[in-house]
Amino acid sequence: AIFFLGRGRSFRTNRSDTLVRAETRQFTLTGRIDTSGVSQPIGMRVTSEGIEARFAGRAVSGLAELATRLPVQAIDPEVHRLVDGGPQERRRYLDWGVFHVEPRFVDHWRRYQRALRQHNAALRTGQAPQLVRAWDPELLEAAEIVASHRERYLARLRTAVGSVGQRLLGLEIDLGLSRGWSAERSLNEALEASFARDRERGLTHAGP
């Protein structure tokens, strides 16, 4: 229930409409968030047509706002994907944590994704090098911000995970992060070095 209030979905299924009993038209979930001694209601109504969420008596504009009100990460049966899954699984988990401690992160992340899509599209369509590289300033700036936010969050997460590992398992657990390009060069240098391969494959290889 807590996860659903914070994410607008269940960690067991992505189809919220399946949570509505066959003989009913909706289900309602409510709770209260206590912040610095101030208690405010949060609630959600799920129907076959979608989800309506409210916080402190007003409609919530989107799931991003909901998540800032009730930040939650779940360790569920699918957590093994963080280890044996691809890097996309780990980035998704990490980025969700960053979003909660750096509210502006989502804006930088979207900006980076937008620039990356344009950069890749220019590569795939075989545009002239100067047209492809025209996206580099936007891509570079957003990528550096995204990478820096991830590194700061991971430093905090590393401390917490290390403490839990020692206390519960008696093990030393450490976490590391690869930025997506060599630490011996800047991202701009990495993009230049991989440009020929990027054009050949229609994909940007260096980046967070």
Predicted regions, residues:
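Conserved NTPase motor "head" modules and their coupling/switch loops across ABC/AAA+ ATPases, GTPases
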Residues: 4, 16, 35, 45, ...
